[in-house]
Amino acid sequence: MSENFKVLIIGGSVAGLTLALCLEKLDISYEILEQGEDISPQVGASIGIMPNGSPVLDQLGVFDDVERVIEPLEFARIRYPDGFFFQSQYPAIIADHFGYPISFLERQKFLQILYSKIRYKERVHTGQKAVRIESHESHVVVRTADKQYSGHLVVGADGVHSIVRSEIWRLSEPGAITDEEKTALRVEYACVYGISSGVRGVTDGVQLSLLDHGVTIHVFNGKAGKVFWFVIIKIDKRYSYTDMPRFSTQDAREICESLKSKLLDTSVSFGDLWAKCDIFMMTPLEEGHFQTWHRGRLVCVGDAVRKLTPNIGQGANMAIEDIAVLANALFRANVRDGLPDDRQIDDVLSQLSATRLPATKTTCKQSEFLTRLQAGDGIWRRLAARYIFPALHDIPAASSARVLKGGQRLDFVDPPQRARPELDRWAWVKDLRGYVPRPHVLYLICGALLAWWASGLVWHFPSKLDTTILSHV
């Protein structure tokens, strides 16, 4: 009896479970090795599924289950520290043009949905932390503390602290991985995220955002009175990945206490969310991407190759697209009917990096820009965020098209029925209700500069609050 091609998936989160569902569609054998004891732990996190990730989930029979447990976003209300606010219809515009709503739900619930669709649950092994990978001529071996697993391809879906990425570096020729790549990730921001329940004044379908100096707060509502929130703060300096800061529960608590008076809406303060908080965590926000995604029979996807901030909401969606490209490449290589040699494996993995690296670079740049714009990092961004951004009304929805447009699809499953034909981005902008011609934008820029120079009433410079926040990190 001939040996079947097997994929060893390191990590049983979004990317790992999505890949398992794809491999089941392709009738390709796999094993998932998840270091945690629970495949869907409650860590206080939420997840945003965007229209570039939704079609793949739709093809896998997952999105209907997601849609049943969300409150679709319809519009956003963005507030500034001087009390000014404006509303944007960007969530409704995006849903109308792509056929899928922006969907927020508990990360735990999303993982439960993915896991419920797995047919061969006996192939999912929890409590199995990979500690070493051996690459042989025609196969690979993954060793955990007490077991070993053999296969023909290792996929690192194991997050930012990826053991698979470390093993790719270890197995590479001397000098192949540069010092620049090893230090590609850096940390300038941190995030306190949490889930609250029963917060009065938070309306279904409305995103609340506060763009303050050095602090950004985003709030999304879910089913059954759940409220998901993120507090993104700029920390005291830039850290490298190898020297990134660690945060305690007390750090997070003190930061949230210091923000209680911040108004998110006319009748909702951050203190209202904090008083009803069920669970919260704090984490540094790594930013950046790696150039080397694979070597031999090892490959990385998702957070193992790029890190984005929550501001752009693309971490999970980019991972889902990675999986779609990898699964399509395996489908075209017809690995189910034979064992591919090293050259054929390299061809498959090269398709992934060639397709996804350009999108990664673009999205990382957009994430970095948006994070700093929303935090008012520097006088020019403060001016743009306060005066230019509101004047554009719904036009920023069109800029989202650059990330969402051209989302990957599975070639071996029927096309998603509800996905709509993509529109030209410029035509989309013209159709928006809040369209502002380019010359007017220039006038607004000049007006903003004059207003700032004449009155000095733009956002305050670092205050006692800002100093307090930074002192905790």
Swiss-Prot record:
Pathway: Secondary metabolite biosynthesis
Keywords recorded for this protein, A-Z: FAD, Flavoprotein, Membrane, Monooxygenase, Oxidoreductase, Signal, Transmembrane, Transmembrane helix
Protein name as it appears in the record: FAD-dependent monooxygeanse terM
Keyword Signal attached: yes
The organism's place on the tree of life at top rank: Eukaryota
Record-level GO cellular component terms: membrane
Keyword DNA-binding belongs to the record: no
Leader peptide range in chain numbering: 1-22
